[in-house]
């Protein structure tokens, strides 16, 4: 049985998303278990936040107390415990948390996996289990194994999308037992800007009304108020593509309809995730707050869909 993100009967469109509390976050994803909400984001050991209502957030510690031992095998230069860009899904009674180990600007990288039976630290079953590496890249590869996102296709088959710069966004089929790449699975490139420096990363795929929507981030994060990050989207009838934007331009040729490029206060929105509860949807991302010297800040906003099935804010 597959549960993507069990948000229960919450109607996202009826909520007031004026977030409060501990909102420092980079590359956030969300899950909900019972009545409690959780955010996982980039930081020491993967940072966790929690909320009783999805609006008021507080820090709740970390997934890993230190860098998992095996990481140095794949990323020898990694000398701190800063883990990047997690993604979480719930499948067959287990939470699967994917995350990235890398150093800035290099593609010597690895995606790791941790599992847990619950997200509630008060539960006696609460324990993050290190499941080791999922897929890695080296300097000789033309892709970068960071920014994981797991998506289940309409037949319930899990896939992993990932990628940052280099040749762009990748997709590979997962084994349903291990939730790691299936034997002989082919690595597919599904989106690329088509020109250097190929500033595309952070894929997130969702399925809605027979279309797969590929959300990505264009341009540059991590520069505070100088960031140029923006969220773009395309869609396909097939999970493997071809993904095209609103104008029919292939995402393999630089296509991507801009969903959000920020404003004077919220600069460089990106690294987004999209969740559904019934017919309602939210967009989760970080943006750099110009009023706080460019601090990366959690954003959750209702995401709407036009008559042609394209998302808008």
UniProtKB/Swiss-Prot annotation:
Q: Which CDD domains does the entry link to?
A: GH43_Arb43a-like
What molecular function does GO assign, one term? arabinan endo-1,5-alpha-L-arabinosidase activity
Q: How is the cofactor bound?
A: Binds 1 Ca(2+) ion per subunit.
Q: What is its EC number?
A: 3.2.1.99
Pathway of this protein? Answer: Glycan metabolism; L-arabinan degradation
| Catalytic function, reaction form | Endohydrolysis of (1->5)-alpha-arabinofuranosidic linkages in (1->5)-arabinans
Cofactor field: Ca(2+)
Give UniProt keywords alphabetically: Calcium, Carbohydrate metabolism, Cytoplasm, Glycosidase, Hydrolase, Metal-binding
What is the annotated temperature dependence of this protein's activity?
A: Optimum temperature is 70 degrees Celsius. The enzyme is stable for 30 minutes at temperatures up to 70 degrees Celsius.
Residue sites binding substrate per the record: 27, 105, 144-147, 164-166
One GO biological process this protein is involved in is: arabinan catabolic process
Q: What top-level class of enzyme does the UniProt entry assign?
A: hydrolase
Give site residues, Important for substrate recognition. 271
Q: What family does the database annotate?
A: Belongs to the glycosyl hydrolase 43 family.
Assembly and oligomerization: Monomer.
Please explain the role this protein plays, according to its UniProt record.
Involved in the degradation of arabinan and is a key enzyme in the complete degradation of the plant cell wall. Catalyzes the cleavage of endo alpha-(1->5)-L-arabinofuranosyl residues in debranched arabinan.
User: What is the protein's name according to its record?
Assistant: Intracellular endo-alpha-(1->5)-L-arabinanase
């Amino acid at each position: 049985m597959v549960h993507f993100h069990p948000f229960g009967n919450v109607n996202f469109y009826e909520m007031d998303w004026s977030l409060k509390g501990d909102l420092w976050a980079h590359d956030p994803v969300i899950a909900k278990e019972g009545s409690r909400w959780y955010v996982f984001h980039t930081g020491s050991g993967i940072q966790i936040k929690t909320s009783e209502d999805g609006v008021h957030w507080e820090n709740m510690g970390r997934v890993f107390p230190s860098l998992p031992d095996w990481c140095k095998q794949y990323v020898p230069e990694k000398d701190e415990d800063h883990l990047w860009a997690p993604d979480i899904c719930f499948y067959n009674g287990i939470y699967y948390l994917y995350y990235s180990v890398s150093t800035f600007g290099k593609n010597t990288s690895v995606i790791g996996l941790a599992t847990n039976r619950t997200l509630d630290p008060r539960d006696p079953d609460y324990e993050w289990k290190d499941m080791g590496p999922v897929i890695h890249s080296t300097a000789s590869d033309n892709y970068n194994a960071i920014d994981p996102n797991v998506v289940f296709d309409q037949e319930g088959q899990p896939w992993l999308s990932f990628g940052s710069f280099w040749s762009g966004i990748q997709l590979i089929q997962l084994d349903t037992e291990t939730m790691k790449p299936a034997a002989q699975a082919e690595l597919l490139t599904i989106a690329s800007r088509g020109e250097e420096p190929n500033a595309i990363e952070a894929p997130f795929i969702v399925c809605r009304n027979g279309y797969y929507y590929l959300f990505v981030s264009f341009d540059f994060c991590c520069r505070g108020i100088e960031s140029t990050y923006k969220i773009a989207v395309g869609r396909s009838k097939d999970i493997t593509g071809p993904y095209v934007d609103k104008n029919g331009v292939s995402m393999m040729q630089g296509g991507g309809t801009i969903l959000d490029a920020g404003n004077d206060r919220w600069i460089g929105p990106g690294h987004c995730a999209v969740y559904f509860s019934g017919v309602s949807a939210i967009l989760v991302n970080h943006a750099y707050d110009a009023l706080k010297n460019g601090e990366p800040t959690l954003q959750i906003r209702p995401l709407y869909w036009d008559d042609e099935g394209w998302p808008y804010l």
